[in-house]
Amino acid sequence: MSKIKRILKITFIVIFAVLMLLLTVYINHQIRLNAEAGLRLPLGQMVEVDGHNMSVYVEGTGEATLVFMSGGGTCSPILDFKSLYSLLSDKYQIAVVEKFGYGFSDVVDRDRDLDSILKDTRTALAAAGLNAPYVLCPHSMSGLEALYWAQKYPDEVSAIIGLDMAVPEYYDTMNINIPLMRAAGWAAHIGITRLIPGISDSDAIQYGTLSENEKEIYRAVFFSRTATVTMMNEMGRVMENAEKVDSMGVPQLPMLLFL
């Protein structure tokens, strides 16, 4: 056998082995997803927004409604914020809106400019029976949506409580590697993420007050809502969204920022 033929044979064997490994990982992932379906039952109410379902969780009563807004890529906003809002729901009405592609909401492949994101959030809150004005509690990237909300609809926002929220200037020097993020999305879709020990054990699981059952729910949601196409579209627009917010100036309302 010639040297070239040996190289081609070895290359074919390696490629075939990799493909079989990926197929095995994918099949295992699908089996696990089916087994975890019972854990992915919505914790809040599902409301229709533009023909798709969005998840809205409401807890507590009070004159003020605190709307918790998750950071980019947070797989389960309802559980991620639970350790905090459970301390406040005896005095305030709590609302957690899970954007498309997050938590129990549908994954949709659509543009994620600020106007679209904000329209979805406002529609979901209204469909859940919650009325403005709101106190917005954004984390990380949702800071852009909160600021834009206050700029565009000032009568709907009474205050902003930033939970380490992002501001437009944060993205001035940020280098977002979209191809790498899409590769991560592909790995999550195939199920490669299941091979990484402890990858689903977020701060909410390690340091929060979630019950053991809630931790299992979080992990199940993680493996179905990591680097979704909706999240990828959102990250692809974040620079433009930051520029839009920056061009409109600082909204004039009470703000308390925790860093």
Walk through the language-model features, giving the residues of each.
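Conserved serine/cysteine hydrolase catalytic core
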Residues: L210-L259
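Gly/Ala-rich beta-loop-alpha elbow adjacent to hydrolase catalytic centers
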Residues: P138-S142, A146
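Residue in the alpha/beta-hydrolase core beta-strand immediately N-terminal to the catalytic nucleophile
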Residues: Y134-V135, S158-I161
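Active-site signature of alpha/beta-hydrolase-fold catalytic machinery across serine-
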Residues: Y148-K152
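Conserved HGGG/HGGXW glycine-rich cap/lid loop of the alpha/beta-hydrolase fold
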Residues: H52-F104
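Active-site loop/oxyanion-hole signature of alpha/beta-hydrolase fold enzymes
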Residues: V96-C137
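Alpha/beta-hydrolase fold catalytic core
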Residues: S2-L66, D90-Y92
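Flexible "cap/lid" loop of the alpha/beta hydrolase fold
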Residues: I161-I190
